[in-house]
Amino acid sequence: MAVERVSGGSSLIDVLDRVLDKGIVIDAWVRISLVGIDLITVEARVVVASIDTYLKYADAVGLTGLVSRPQLTEVVEEPVVVEAPATRRTARPSRRRI
């Protein structure tokens, strides 16, 4: 007698895709004490999400205010001409944002 598997479940790739798309947060707080004296206290918050999902929800709750985010503008470099009394030379290009 052969055993048949039902393929109605989710594969690992489907689960990972959903977790990265929606994101999950694991919030843990553990305290170990002996006779009323705290020996170890552990507080942890683990966020599992894609970068886009994290930034979208972190902006909504104001968590990205402390982090410097790079500007997503195009940088155009133009040469700067520096004129000296006796010679003329080209300095390093400066960076100008559009």
Swiss-Prot record:
- Keyword list, A-Z: Gas vesicle
For this UniProt entry, the molecular function terms from Gene Ontology, in alphabetical order, are: structural molecule activity
Q: Which top-level group of life is the source organism from?
A: Bacteria
Per the record, what is one GO cellular component? Answer: gas vesicle shell
Q: Where in the cell is it found?
A: Gas vesicle shell
Q: Which InterPro entries match?
A: Gas-vesicle_GvpA-like (IPR000638), Gas_vesicle_GvpA (IPR047870), GvpA (IPR050530), GvpA-like_CS (IPR018493)
Functionally, this protein is described as follows: Gas vesicles are hollow, gas filled proteinaceous nanostructures found in some microorganisms. During planktonic growth they allow positioning of the organism at a favorable depth for light or nutrient acquisition. GvpA forms the protein shell.
Q: How does it assemble?
A: The gas vesicle shell is 2 nm thick and consists of a single layer of this protein. It forms helical ribs nearly perpendicular to the long axis of the vesicle.
Q: What family, per the record?
A: Belongs to the gas vesicle GvpA family.
**Which protein is depicted?**
Gas vesicle protein A
Gene coding for it: gvpA
